[in-house]
Amino acid sequence: MDVTNMPKISVVIVTFNSGNVLEGAIKSFINQDYLNKELVIIDGASKDNTLSIIRKYENNIGYWCSEPDHGIYDAMNKGWARSSGDYILYLGSDDRLLEGGLSALGKNSSGADLVFGDVKCLHENGVVKERITTSNFEVLRIHSIFSHQSLIMKKSLFEKYNGFDCRYKLLADYDLVLRTYLGGAKLQYVHHFISLFNMGGVSAFTYKSDFEKLKIHKSTKSISHPYILFMENLIVKSLLIVKNRWLKI
């Protein structure tokens, strides 16, 4: 692989007291066959063995810090600001890059502003399910079509749009990608499984995320009637909750 012709990808891991899983994420980065890469770790002043693991792999890390932050998206903003890559990918400390993931994104970037692929989801019961991303980008106006573990975005876009809006606690990544899309960013979809996403973290199946999505739709004006979509989502989720309780699922 000719490194000089491949864009540099910075993989940012944001972590806090995740020493029990961080090493696996680091190893999944090291094992990638894509050569023009950089690992950045932003730690929120962990008190467990996180720092000892970071120091163990320090020769494989381009930059790392351990300091207090104001939440996950504040830490993620530090990540892109302190990266040197052409593209940025965010990986959770309990997520894993899959074989050939970075190569699939880097080789198929073709100068696109955002490149994303598919993801495998690890559920709490140990079941792994495949999630195929749609290539119908217009769906972004309504909801997210990607997992940030399978997405690279140009650093220049983070700079142009001032990164993640920390007013959002759950969907700031969706907000940022939506703003770039509405601003004319070029998107590229790659049919390849990029990462294993651990679903044990923040759940998208919450009412809080619906309220955040409503705010995002109103702010970006991505759809004509955001309140109608908001109410439809609430009704569907409420019916599912009633059904699950009735069936004792």
What are these regions (language model features)?
Residues 1-30:
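N-proximal low-complexity "stem/linker" segments adjacent to membrane-targeting elements
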Residues 96, 100-129:
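Conserved donor NDP-sugar-binding/catalytic core segment of glycosyltransferases
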Residues 134-212, 216:
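Conserved nucleotide-sugar donor-binding catalytic segment
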